[in-house]
Amino acid sequence: MQSLVKFILSAGLVVLIMPRPGYALDADQKAVLDAYKKPWDIYVSAMEGLENSIKSANNDGDVVKAADKFCDEANRFVDEYNAVREKYQGSDLIKSMDNDADAKKNIEDFMTDLRKKIEASKGTFDALKSDLSKYASSPEIKRVQNRLASTMNRIQLVEL
């Protein structure tokens, strides 16, 4: 989890924002920024879903189901993020936004909000880790541990 927070903070995802009133963006900038924000909404939703599922998990089957669902959504996030990045990376619009004060402010606001959400999810990942340890003898738990590791590796590669 710590490496995920480090990834979010250090990746320099200068194209991510959440539109806020008061920070004027033209229609093209807003469209690009919204496109980059959409995959992160998927990831935040996946974290929230995992939190709710782990809280109500009563057995290893519930933990496996929760972890599998998180992996499905987190992998969807990676796929959608990569598609957006391929579409816009290196474009003139993205380059122009690097020098736009309003775009930078939107990016800062989004990154601050995202950082808070990711830091708040630390307890969820700690609870998941505890549940995975508690049911470690289950073959399905071992499978889902491997799947979680692969998924987290994909998430970390988003920055590349």
Regions found by a protein language model. Name each.
Residues 1-9:
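Bacterial N-terminal signal peptides that target proteins for export
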Residues 4, 13-14, 31, 62, ...:
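Detector for intrinsically disordered, low-structure N-terminal pre-sequences
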Residues 14-22:
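C-terminal segment of classical bacterial N-terminal signal peptides
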Residues 22-75, 152-160:
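Immediate post-signal-peptide N-terminus of mature secreted/exported proteins
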Residues 36, 70-143, 147:
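Long, amphipathic, charge-rich alpha-helical segments that form helical bundles/coiled-coils
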